[in-house]
């Protein structure tokens, strides 16, 4: 940027000067102004631009105001630079003209500035002189002179003047810099002729800056209301020093953002004036740091004050200092405690509050307990209750509401003696002496009239004679006389309460005490406590009921007195069912009012009195309130006493380690850690970097560690329970890892490969894999522990599966959940000569639990086992046997296996029979199916599917095969044994059955091709074909009954 670009002096807003002579005006060349000599300012000739193309009706340039390029002077500085006034002196006085060669060269940042309902466009001489606007420049407008002229002709002059002043005010802030320096035209060399000025104009602009102390023009216009937009005023109005700050003005120039320094966010100051910093020390101290400036070399002044001295005048601190706590039997004498309680009782009497008398009674009870080392007798308590009763009230009998005998509103008749007058029917009044009354009672007894004698004695109030006589009669009569006697007493009479209690009833005073009409409750409690005869539990319930009644009337201290007499245990604040939490305080109110200092002190005195008798009287739920009291002591500056409380609480927690709460332990250690420096013993023994701790605090830390370890150990059973399924999951994962190897052999004839089955999945079950090969392996080959099938015989899907799965079924029924219906719709039967294997075999010989044609000895054993069921079961008809076999085959074809009991209908492939449902009826449980022959049993040795459903072997039913099952019955037992391994179930499948029954058993590895199978003698049929066809296996029928679907 060239340094010779001039700056235009600020225009004057004062009164317009007189017209300048024509000789002093500059020449006119092509519509451009030339500088003409003007007045001197500071010894320098200043040129002034004038318009020599003045028209008869001069037009105002509405954009001229915004194009003022330099400083915005203040109102007080307009008259200081009169020689630099650049008003147009020709034409109308005071009307401004634009200078198109300089001011209109670069328009304002906003091209069409709206004011009111009109828009003011650019200067008309741009298009008239043929200047080509720059492409993409924001400083170019495309308005013609015709539009500008049309707009100017229809605008009043006064409005143009007002807008010029407003627009100059609003945009001088943004355009006070030199447009030749900031605009893009100066760098591209596109300045027009006549735009070169002397350098003296720049120096004049620097010397003509107004005073900083004057008020901003924007502020003045805002005050007088000349601003057209308050929003624009807020955008451009700044303080006076910022108006002439080049750094602040640089923020408004249209330059790239990277050239503008961006101020980072600054956090506001927390304090704007110097202040005192305050903190609390560990020994109940208040530490104050006075304000200072360390950068100026000032030393900070630290003041240490004692909170105990500052808060010495508070009533709460005085109350805490007067209490001799912590109350430890070895450290505090009971005389001091009794003195404190007596003072509190006297204060409660003088208070005059409604509960003051009951509060004083509680403090007196604590004095009595402290005097008697925590023990109390009924007579002592009765004496305490009757101390405040100066004179006993005279209890008057109220008018009877109803007779207790016949519930009639009648009273005893008037006493009279003498015969009734037969004429008038009246009885003459007669006054009889007590001797005459007793004589009449005796005369009636002479003649054996006991009932009349009782009535006479009751009418004449001879209750002693009546009670004695009725006691020797029947019990009903005695109760009648007793009721008559008690009805003569007042309801609020303590004698009435005692007699009702001795009669085995809850006195009416227990539910009515506390009313103003009833009277004082103390004599009733005194008579109950003094007379211990009767049922102790009834007496306790009466006292508790009386306390509940008093508590419902708002008499908390009186209710708690009754609870102490009934030995009600202390509870917790959050449990509404607990009657006692703090002595003399109801836990139905807010906690600050509930946990008052007086209530805590009262309860601590009670705890101290209980420990005086040598008995463990610590209240476990009260220790947290003692900790709260200790923290309050620390707040009031009594740090040493608070630390002693921590020691007492720690001792109590260690003595009740089983019932201590972990949160209480943590908070106690935390508070003791803060207050341990308040103990002089700790300060004396403190040495080195490590602070010495008392023994009880160290024991608390060890107890906390033990609690944390115990909590971690308590979580181990849960983790052990989680590990147990983990072990099972390991076994199952091994099983699932071998699953793809088994699925390779699912391409057997008539079967479809399928993933792990779901209860709704249908299809043919995949038989166990069999590897074709020689019957025996090579010589010297190791014999595996698991039997390996060498030959796989194609088995139809309609064949029944091996009966050896009954052991699986037995295991499934054993491990099933209670109430779960696990029974299969098939009835599992075995031939008579087959041996039932009820326990899984060893892992070393994991043969399948299938049927075997055993020797006659085993047949006898089976007969002996099933002989006890002979009279309970009836033989099934052969017709039902065939139907059962059809249903079994249909269940096998359904592909559900173990899940077949979920289905109520067979699949589409199953043969439909009208009598098919009869096998599932309850009547079918008494019928036995036809046992198959060994030839048919050999066909039943086909391996059950493993991959379709894990419990499929348990769902195998032994029944007569039909159709293709009989057509393939020519297979010998040796071929069957060689083809199916051991019992029709290979080693892995038998192991999987054990896995189901015993999850801890690991799954055996896959079978090895060419291995020699183990010999199982039980698979060799030794039973004739006709054996077992007539008698069912009743033991199997008993174990596996048929359940309806």
From Swiss-Prot:
Residues 1-78, 149-193, 707-733, 748-789, 813-1045 are annotated as: Disordered. Residues 773-784 have a biased composition (Low complexity). It is found in: Endoplasmic reticulum membrane; Golgi apparatus membrane. Residues 22-33, 149-168 have a biased composition (Basic and acidic residues). Residues 957-966 have a biased composition (Gly residues). The keyword Protein transport applies. The modification Phosphoserine is found at residues 55, 137, 186, 852, 858, 866-867. Liver. Plays a role in the organization of the endoplasmic reticulum exit sites (ERES), also known as transitional endoplasmic reticulum (tER). Required for secretory cargo traffic from the endoplasmic reticulum to the Golgi apparatus. Involved in peroxisome biogenesis. Regulates the transport of peroxisomal biogenesis factors PEX3 and PEX16 from the ER to peroxisomes. Belongs to the SEC16 family. This is Protein transport protein Sec16B. It comes from Oryctolagus cuniculus (Rabbit).
């Amino acid at each position: 940027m060239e340094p010779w670009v001039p700056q235009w002096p600020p225009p004057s807003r004062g009164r317009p000067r007189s017209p300048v002579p024509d000789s002093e005006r500059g020449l006119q060349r092509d519509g451009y102004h030339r500088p003409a000599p003007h007045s001197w300012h500071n010894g320098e000739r200043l040129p002034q631009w004038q318009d020599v193309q003045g028209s008869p009706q001069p037009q105002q340039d509405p954009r001229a105001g915004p194009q003022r390029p330099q400083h915005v002077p203040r109102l007080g500085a307009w008259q200081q630079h009169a020689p630099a006034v650049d008003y147009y002196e020709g034409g109308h006085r005071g009307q401004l003209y634009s200078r198109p060669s300089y001011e209109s060269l670069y328009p304002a940042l906003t091209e069409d500035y709206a004011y009111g309902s009109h828009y003011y466009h650019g200067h008309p001489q741009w298009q008239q002189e043929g200047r080509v606007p720059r492409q993409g420049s924001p400083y170019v407008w495309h308005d013609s002179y015709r539009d500008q002229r049309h707009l100017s002709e229809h605008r009043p002059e006064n409005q143009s003047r007002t807008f010029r002043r407003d627009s100059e005010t609003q945009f001088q802030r943004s355009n006070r810099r030199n447009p030749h320096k900031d605009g893009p035209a100066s760098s591209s060399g596109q300045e027009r002729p006549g735009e070169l000025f002397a350098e003296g104009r720049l120096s004049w602009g620097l010397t003509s800056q107004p005073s900083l102390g004057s008020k901003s023009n924007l502020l003045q216009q805002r005050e007088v209301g000349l601003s057209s937009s308050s929003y624009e005023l807020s955008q451009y109005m700044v303080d006076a020093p910022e108006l002439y700050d080049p750094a602040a003005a640089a923020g408004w120039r249209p330059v790239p953002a990277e050239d503008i320094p961006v101020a980072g966010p600054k956090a506001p100051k927390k304090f704007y004036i110097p202040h005192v910093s305050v903190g609390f020390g560990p020994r109940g101290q208040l530490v104050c740091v006075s304000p200072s400036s360390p950068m100026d070399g000032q030393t900070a002044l630290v003041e240490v004050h004692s909170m105990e001295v500052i808060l010495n005048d508070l009533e709460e601190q005085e109350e805490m200092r007067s209490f001799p706590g912590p109350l430890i039997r070895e450290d505090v004498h009971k005389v001091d405690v009794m003195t404190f309680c007596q003072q509190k009782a006297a204060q409660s009497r003088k208070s005059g509050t409604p509960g003051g008398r009951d509060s004083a009674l509680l403090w007196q009870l604590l004095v009595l307990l402290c005097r008697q080392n925590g023990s109390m007798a009924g007579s002592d308590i009765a004496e305490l209750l009757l101390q405040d009763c100066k004179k006993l009230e005279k209890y008057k009998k109220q008018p009877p509401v109803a007779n207790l005998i016949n519930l009639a509103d009648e009273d005893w008749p008037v006493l009279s003696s003498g015969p009734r007058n037969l004429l008038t029917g009246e009885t003459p009044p007669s006054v009889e002496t007590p001797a005459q009354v007793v004589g009449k009672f005796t005369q009636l007894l002479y003649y054996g009239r006991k009932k009349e004698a009782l009535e006479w004695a009751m009418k004449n109030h001879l209750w002693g004679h009546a009670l004695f006589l009725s006691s020797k009669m029947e019990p009903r009569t005695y109760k009648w006389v007793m009721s008559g006697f008690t009805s003569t007493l007042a309801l609020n009479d303590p004698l009435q309460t005692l007699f009702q209690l001795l009669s085995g009833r809850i006195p009416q005073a227990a539910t009515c005490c506390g009313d103003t009409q009833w009277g004082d409750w103390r004599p009733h409690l005194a008579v109950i406590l003094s007379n211990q005869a009767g049922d102790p539990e009834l007496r306790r319930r009466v006292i508790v009921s009386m306390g509940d009644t008093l508590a419902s009337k708002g008499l908390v201290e009186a209710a708690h007195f009754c609870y102490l007499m009934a030995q009600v245990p202390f509870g917790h604040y959050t449990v509404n069912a607990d009657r006692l939490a703090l002595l003399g305080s109801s836990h139905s109110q807010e906690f600050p009012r509930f946990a008052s200092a007086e209530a805590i002190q009262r309860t601590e005195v009670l705890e101290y009195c209980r420990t005086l008798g040598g008995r463990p009287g610590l209240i476990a739920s009260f220790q947290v309130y003692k900790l709260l009291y200790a923290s309050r002591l620390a707040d009031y500056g009594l740090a040493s006493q608070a630390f002693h409380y921590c020691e007492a609480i720690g001792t109590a927690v260690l003595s009740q380690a089983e019932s201590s709460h972990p949160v209480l332990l943590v908070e106690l250690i935390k508070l003791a850690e803060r207050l341990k420096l308040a103990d002089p013993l700790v300060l004396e023994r403190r040495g080195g970097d490590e602070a010495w701790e008392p023994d009880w605090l160290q024991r608390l830390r060890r107890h906390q560690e033990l609690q944390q370890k115990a909590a971690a150990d308590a979580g181990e059973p849960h983790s052990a329970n989680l590990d147990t399924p983990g072990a099972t999951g390991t076994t199952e994962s091994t099983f699932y890892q071998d699953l793809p190897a088994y699925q390779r052999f699912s391409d057997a004839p008539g079967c479809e490969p399928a993933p792990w089955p779901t209860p709704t999945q249908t299809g043919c079950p995949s038989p166990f894999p069999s590897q074709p090969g020689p019957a025996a392996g090579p010589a010297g080959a190791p014999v595996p522990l698991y039997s390996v099938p060498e030959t796989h015989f194609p088995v139809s899907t309609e064949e029944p599966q091996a009966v050896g799965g009954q052991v699986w079924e037995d295991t499934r029924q054993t491990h099933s959940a209670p109430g779960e219906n696990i029974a299969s719709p098939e009835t599992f039967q075995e031939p008579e000569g087959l041996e039932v294997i009820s326990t899984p075999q060893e892992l070393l010989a994991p043969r399948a639990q299938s049927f075997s044609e055993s020797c006659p000895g085993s047949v006898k054993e089976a007969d002996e086992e099933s002989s006890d069921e002979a009279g309970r079961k009836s033989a099934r008809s052969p017709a039902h046997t065939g139907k059962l076999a059809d249903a079994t085959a249909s269940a096998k074809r359904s592909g559900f296996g173990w899940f077949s009991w979920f289905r109520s209908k067979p699949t589409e492939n199953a043969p439909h029979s009208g009598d098919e449902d009869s096998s599932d009826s309850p009547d079918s449980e008494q019928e036995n199916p036809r046992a198959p022959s060994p030839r048919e049993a050999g066909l039943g040795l086909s391996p059950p599917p493993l991959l379709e459903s894990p419990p499929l072997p348990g769902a195998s039913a032994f029944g007569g095969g039909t159709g293709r099952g009989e057509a393939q019955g020519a297979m010998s037992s040796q071929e069957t044994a060689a083809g199916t391994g051991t019992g029709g179930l290979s080693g892995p499948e038998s192991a999987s059955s054990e896995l189901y029954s015993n999850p801890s058993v690991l799954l055996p590895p896959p079978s090895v091709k060419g291995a020699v199978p183990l010999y199982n003698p039980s698979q060799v049929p030794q039973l004739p074909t006709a054996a077992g066809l007539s008698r069912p296996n009743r033991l199997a029928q008993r174990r596996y009954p048929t359940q309806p679907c």
